[in-house]
Design a protein with these regions (language model features):
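Transmembrane helical elements of multi-pass membrane transporters/channels
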Residues: 23-42, 146, 180, 209-213, ...
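Short runs within selected transmembrane alpha-helices of multi-pass transporters and secretion channels
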Residues: 75-78, 147-165, 173-184, 202-217, ...
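Short alpha-helical transmembrane segments in multi-pass integral membrane proteins
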Residues: 1-25, 85-150, 194-251, 309-374, ...
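Small-residue-rich hydrophobic transmembrane alpha-helices
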Residues: 57-117, 154-173, 269, 281-341, ...
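Alpha-helical transmembrane segments and their lipid-water interface positions
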Residues: 31, 35, 39-46, 71-78, ...
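N-terminal transmembrane alpha-helices
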Residues: 12-52, 65-80, 84, 109-116, ...
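Helix-terminus/linker motif at the lipid-water interface of multi-pass membrane proteins
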Residues: 33, 37-57, 127-134, 190-197, ...
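Small-residue hotspots at the loop-to-helix junctions and early N-terminal turns
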Residues: 54-65, 140, 144, 203, ...
Length: 461
């Protein structure tokens, strides 16, 4: 079987856990930062379009729910398939691992085409449902329609990258993201300002960039990776059905997490449009963008740790699973403590990245401080969710995805502004309250269920 000889691979079975996680997480961190540029660069440039920047920025924020739905489907098949892929490789069953990857790829492509058609058909009514005013719709509709054309390459680039990382090629995974992100960085000012396409130009630049990333991912997995990608053939369908069920079952937690993020975004925008108007939708767009920036290294550490945890769990090495979980938790908590301090002490610095509008700045500073007041508790949710997903604990992963967002955040988004008369502050305050409650419950449950299982596995060896 052909292998990539010129790229150093990570040995999940041997080597120190800390080095393995860092070797996987650092390239992923670079990749995640570059991936963040897809959306952040758009927002920075859009906010600076003469005369219409603030309104256009809010309009892009109204498109977030649909973009999050696309990410949700990518996670359903990518994050659902990759841990199973790693577990099978840890067991030495590479044939099943390859079938899992191909099943994920086939389902991902099919869902991308269906999703694109549905969203294009209902783009205008969906944006209105999300809280778009007539002014906002003028900017949001063309941006969204162009963005949706790139649904398939966007989902391939996002959903299939975990299978590159799961084979130990984290640097290649980083490179696949870098190609598109750098292209977007170059193309955005060209299409927005030089060609004078405004907000439409931002969408065109993003679609072209996503196409470049997706092309690289397919090329590598088809021709260079150890386990190669292909569509599932008709005669393989019966054999793949069980794998498809397992992929969807495990991926449902990541799917639900992104889907509920979309639902929360819709609810927040609806309440803010009533209690604060269009300017507060722009404020929420900035707050959400800063959250994405802050969370990027956390996602990198999680995704860098996940294949190591899954592989060693499949290989029945509980000591390495436990150590990987502890290392992941320490890295995440240490990083968050630093970023939490910066957000609370220097919010202006972060907001200035997106806009220097005086009225926007005044409202955004207080909103940012409230929103991130208990952000460190969110780490407990991330750690618990990653462990559950990596160990194929489907029910727990799905439950805790739903608990914090659906049963805590969304009700509070309406209760705090209206029932408690907190207005716009209530929308932003719903987040820290949910972090404390949901994060604590998830983490404690993880400790009480996973540690005894690892102890039992150790005794059985």
């Amino acid at each position: 079987m052909e292998k990539v000889k010129y790229m150093k691979r990570i040995d999940f079975e041997n080597g120190t856990i800390t080095n393995n996680i860092l070797n996987a997480a650092i390239p992923m961190l670079v990749a995640q930062i570059l991936s963040l540029l897809y959306n952040i660069v758009d927002r920075v440039y859009i906010a600076r379009i003469p005369d219409v920047g603030t309104n256009a920025l809010g309009a892009v924020g109204l498109c977030f729910p649909i973009i999050l739905i696309m990410t949700a489907f990518s996670n359903l098949f990518g994050s659902g398939g990759a841990p199973l892929f790693s577990i099978k490789r840890g067991m030495g069953d590479e044939k099943s691992a390859n079938t899992i990857m191909n099943t994920s790829f086939t389902m991902l492509c099919g869902s991308a085409i269906i999703l694109m058609c549905i969203c294009l058909l209902f783009a205008a009514p969906l944006l209105t449902l999300f809280g778009a005013s007539d002014t906002a719709l003028k900017y949001a509709y063309p941006y969204l329609c162009i963005y949706l054309i790139g649904t398939l390459p966007s989902m391939i680039a996002t959903g299939m990258n975990p299978f590159i990382n799961a084979q130990g090629y984290s640097t290649i995974g980083m490179l696949s993201v870098a190609i598109g992100a750098i292209a977007n960085l170059i193309l955005d000012p060209v299409f927005i300002f030089i060609l004078n396409l405004g907000i439409k130009g931002a969408a065109v630049a993003t679609v072209i960039s996503q196409l470049m990333s997706a092309s690289f991912v397919i090329y590598f997995l088809k021709f260079k990776a150890e386990l190669k990608i292909s569509f599932i053939r008709k005669n393989e369908l019966p054999h793949c059905l069980n794998f498809a069920k397992d992929i969807i079952s495990l991926g449902t937690s990541g799917f639900v997490m992104q889907l509920t993020n979309s639902l929360v975004s819709i609810c927040c925008n609806n309440v803010l449009s009533v209690t604060g108007g269009d300017i507060y939708i722009s404020v929420m767009t900035i707050v959400s963008s800063i959250r994405q920036m802050v969370e990027t290294p956390i996602y990198a550490i999680n995704e860098g740790s996940s294949p190591i945890i899954s592989y060693n769990y499949g290989a029945k090495r509980p000591g390495r699973v436990r150590k990987a979980g502890l290392t992941m938790g320490a890295l995440i908590l240490g990083y968050t403590a630093v970023m939490w301090s910066i957000i609370l002490l220097a919010p202006h610095m972060l907001i200035n990245i997106f806009s220097s509008d005086t009225s926007l700045m005044e409202n955004a500073v207080s909103a940012l401080k409230i929103y991130f007041a208990a952000f460190i508790f969110m780490d407990l949710q991330y750690i618990g969710q990653t462990i559950f997903k990596s160990l194929n604990k489907k029910k727990q992963a799905i439950f805790f995805s739903l608990l914090r967002k659906v049963f805590i955040v969304i009700p509070l988004t309406y209760i705090m502004p209206y029932a408690l008369n907190m207005g716009t502050n209530g929308v932003f305050a719903a987040e820290p309250v949910s972090n404390i409650i949901g994060g604590s419950i998830c983490f404690i449950t993880m400790l009480c269920t996973i540690l005894p299982e690892l102890k039992q596995m150790e005794n059985d060896r």
